C-alpha cells in the first residue's frame, strides 16, 4: 500500500496542475532520446526487490578461507556494511574480520549522542530516499531491528516513515519571516536551456567545472536553487559533475522538491536507527571492533599487481598481511576534524588534520590509479559548513515553530531562511529523536552554509558564534525578538559543530581524482567512501557507502550475486515528462 503523502503532490496542491507549453514535451522527448534505450523504472525496481527475496536461495558453495583475515580501515557505515556482506554473502568467519577505527565510537558520519542534562548533538542529518537507496534497503532487510527483532531495520524505517509522511509547508522564508510560495521553480528560458543542455552533456566533458561556470546569475536567485542547494548542501562553487549526477539520480524528486515528500526519515537519529542495529548484527557474528586504532600507512608489494602487505598504526605498531588477507580502506571521511562548541562557546577552529585523507594521500602517492585527495581536501574555506543542535526543556519553541510553519515535528523537513547571510536552515524531527530524551525534552537541528559571513543580527561570522548567539540569530530571522528571553530560559544547550570538510565530496575535480572501488590490478585491496568512483550514483548519501561496500566485497571475493543497479529514472518517459513540466511551473 503506497504511504500517505509519499507519492505525487500534497493534497492541497492537487488540481493546480495545468497543461504546459509544447516546449515541455520537446524537452522530455529530447532527454528521453538522449538516454538511449528507455527503461521502465518501476520494472527495474521490482526486479531489484525480487533479487532481494531470492538472496537466501542463492547461497554460495561452502568455501574454505582457512585463517584468512579481513582488515577494514575506518569504522563508518561503508566498513560496517562491508563486514555485513562478508558475513552474509561470502560466508566469511566474523571472528576474522577486524574493523579499525581511530575514534572511540563507530558509525563515522552517522552520529548521535548526548543527554537531557548536557544536551544532544548530531553533526548532520541524513535524509534517506525510498526510491534511490536500492542497496541500502536490500542490506538492511537482513539486519534485525533492536526494538522489534521480528522486523528488519528496513521494515522499521519504512513503516515509521509511512506513518510520518513529509510535506513541507514552509520550505523557504524571506527576510520578513514570510513563508514563500515555492510552487514555481522560478526558471527563465536561459535557465531551462542551460539545465537541459547540462543533462545532455556527457560528464566526461565536465572535469573541474563548477555550477557557476555553467549557469548565469539569475539561476542562483531562483526558488529551485535555494531549495536544491540547501536540501543537498551544494554551493555555487561545487562540482558541476556532481550537480549533474544529482539531477539525473534525483530527477524523480525534482517535481516535489518544494515539499520534500521524497525524504525518508528514521525513527531516531541515524546512529541509533542504523548504526547500532548493524553493529549488533556484526557482534552477533563475531566481528571484531578495534577503536582508538589509527592506521597511518599501508605497504604494498613491488610489481604491477596491487597487493597490500602491511598496515602501520599511529602507536608505532604494525600488522603484516599474509597471503589471502584483504584490506578495505575508507579513503576519506567528510566529518574528519569536526569540532564542537556549546551554549557559551563557539566550536573551536579545527586543528587536527583529516586523518583519513592523510592516509589516502600516502597510499595514492605510491602508485597511479589510486585517486587524488587534494581537490577535495585542499580548500577548507570552500568545503566547510556549520551545524547546530538545540535542546530545550519543554516544547514552547517547537510549538511556536509548528504554529508558524503548519508542520508538526517530523512532517516538515527543511525550513530555509533564504535571505539570511548564513543561508540558515532548520529541521524539526519527530520527537523523541534520541532514545535518551525524556517526555519534557525537545530537540531540533539546523545548519548554515556561509560560516564566514557576518550574521544579519549577531554581528559576527557564524564560525565565531556561541550556541546562544546562533539561536538568537535564528529567533531574529523569525522576528521573535519579543519572545527571546522566555525561549532562552528553556534552553538546555545549543551545540555548534564546525565541519571543515563536510562538503569536500562536492568540490570541483577531474574524473580521475576519485579512484575505483577496486583499483586496476588489485589482488586484495579496495577503497570505500564518498570519495570513490561509482558510475551513475551520487555522493553524500548512505546508499553510496553501502553500494561501495558491496562492490568491494563482491569483487574481491568473487560473489556470484548481482548488485542492485542504479534505477534509471532519468530514462523513464513519465518521470522525464513530470520533470519537464516542473521546469515550466
Per-range role (PLM):
Residues 87-114:
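Glycine-rich FAD pyrophosphate-binding loop
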Residues 118-158:
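Conserved FAD-binding subdomain of flavin-dependent enzymes
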Residues 249-326, 331:
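Helical element adjacent to the flavin cofactor pocket in flavoenzyme catalytic cores
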Residues 74-76:
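Glycine-rich Rossmann-fold phosphate-binding loop(s) that bind the pyrophosphate
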Residues 251-264, 324-326, 334-547, 554-556, ...:
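C-terminal segments that line or cap access tunnels to active or ligand-binding sites in enzymes
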Residues 555-585:
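Active-site-proximal substrate-binding core of FAD-dependent oxidoreductases
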Residues 21-70, 88-94, 578-585:
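Extreme N-terminal leader/targeting segments of oxidoreductases
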Residues 146-252:
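Rossmann-like flavin
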Amino acid at each position: 500500500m503506497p504511504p500517505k503523502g509519499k507519492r505525487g503532490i500534497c493534497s492541497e496542491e492537487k488540481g493546480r496542475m495545468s497543461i504546459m507549453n509544447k516546449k515541455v514535451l520537446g524537452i522530455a522527448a529530447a532527454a528521453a532520446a538522449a538516454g538511449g534505450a528507455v527503461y521502465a523504472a518501476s520494472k527495474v525496481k521490482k526486479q531489484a526487490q525480487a533479487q532481494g527475496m531470492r538472496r537466501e536461495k542463492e547461497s554460495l558453495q561452502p568455501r574454505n578461507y582457512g585463517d584468512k583475515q579481513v582488515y577494514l580501515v575506518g569504522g563508518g557505515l561503508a566498513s560496517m556494511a562491508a563486514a555485513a556482506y562478508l558475513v552474509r554473502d561470502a560466508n566469511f568467519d566474523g571472528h576474522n574480520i577486524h574493523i579499525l577505527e581511530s575514534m572511540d565510537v563507530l558509525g563515522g558520519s552517522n552520529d548521535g549522542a548526548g543527554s537531557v542534562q548536557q544536551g544532544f548533538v548530531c553533526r548532520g542529518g541524513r535524509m534517506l530516499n525510498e526510491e534511490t537507496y536500492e542497496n541500502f534497503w536490500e542490506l538492511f532487510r537482513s539486519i534485525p531491528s533492536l526494538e522489534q527483532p521480528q522486523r528488519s531495520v528496513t521494515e522499521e524505517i519504512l513503516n515509521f516513515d509511512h506513518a510520518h509522511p513529509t510535506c513541507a509547508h514552509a520550505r523557504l522564508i524571506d527576510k520578513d519571516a514570510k513563508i514563500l510560495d515555492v510552487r514555481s521553480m522560478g526558471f527563465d528560458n536561459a535557465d531551462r536551456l542551460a539545465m537541459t543542455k547540462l543533462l545532455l552533456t556527457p560528464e566526461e566533458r565536465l572535469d573541474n567545472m563548477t555550477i557557476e561556470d555553467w549557469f548565469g546569475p539569475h539561476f542562483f536567485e531562483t526558488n529551485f536553487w535555494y531549495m536544491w542547494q540547501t536540501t543537498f548542501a551544494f554551493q555555487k562553487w561545487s562540482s558541476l559533475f556532481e550537480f549533474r549526477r544529482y539531477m539525473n539520480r534525483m530527477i524523480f524528486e525534482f517535481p516535489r522538491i518544494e515539499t520534500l515528500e521524497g525524504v525518508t526519515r528514521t525513527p531516531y537519529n541515524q546512529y541509533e536507527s542504523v548504526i547500532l542495529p548493524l553493529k549488533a548484527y556484526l557482534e552477533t557474528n563475531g566481528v571484531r571492533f578495534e577503536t582508538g586504532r589509527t592506521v597511518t600507512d599501508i605497504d604494498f608489494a613491488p610489481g604491477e599487481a596491487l597487493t597490500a602487505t602491511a598496515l602501520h598504526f599511529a602507536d608505532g605498531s604494525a600488522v603484516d598481511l599474509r597471503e589471502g588477507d584483504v584490506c578495505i580502506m575508507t579513503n576519506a571521511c567528510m566529518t574528519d576534524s569536526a569540532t564542537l562548541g556549546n551554549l557559551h562557546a563557539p566550536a573551536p577552529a579545527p586543528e587536527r588534520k583529516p586523518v583519513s585523507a592523510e592516509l589516502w594521500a600516502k597510499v595514492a602517492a605510491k602508485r597511479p590509479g589510486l585517486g587524488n585527495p587534494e581537490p577535495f581536501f585542499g580548500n577548507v574555506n570552500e568545503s566547510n559548513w556549520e551545524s547546530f543542535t538545540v535542546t530545550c526543556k519543554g516544547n514552547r519553541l517547537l510549538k511556536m515553530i509548528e504554529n508558524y510553519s503548519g508542520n508538526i515535528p517530523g512532517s516538515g523537513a527543511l525550513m530555509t531562511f533564504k535571505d539570511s547571510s548564513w543561508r540558515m536552515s532548520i529541521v524539526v524531527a519527530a520527537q523523541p529523536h534520541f532514545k535518551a530524551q525524556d517526555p519534557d525534552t525537545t530537540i531540533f537541528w539546523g545548519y548554515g552554509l556561509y560560516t564566514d559571513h557576518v550574521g544579519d543580527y549577531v554581528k559576527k561570522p557564524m564560525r565565531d558564534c556561541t550556541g546562544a548567539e546562533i539561536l538568537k540569530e535564528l529567533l531574529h530571522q523569525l522576528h521573535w525578538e519579543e519572545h527571546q528571553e522566555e525561549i532562552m530560559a528553556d534552553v538546555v544547550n545549543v551545540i555548534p559543530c564546525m565541519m571543515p570538510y563536510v562538503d569536500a565530496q562536492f568540490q570541483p575535480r577531474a574524473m580521475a581524482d576519485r579512484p575505483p572501488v577496486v583499483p586496476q590490478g588489485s589482488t586484495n585491496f579496495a577503497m570505500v567512501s564518498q570519495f570513490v568512483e561509482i558510475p551513475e550514483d551520487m555522493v553524500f548519501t548512505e546508499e553510496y557507502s553501502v553500494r561501495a561496500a558491496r562492490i568491494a566485497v563482491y569483487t574481491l571475493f568473487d560473489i556470484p550475486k548481482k548488485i542492485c543497479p542504479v534505477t534509471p529514472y532519468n530514462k523513464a518517459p513519465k518521470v522525464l515528462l513530470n520533470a519537464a513540466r516542473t521546469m515550466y511551473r
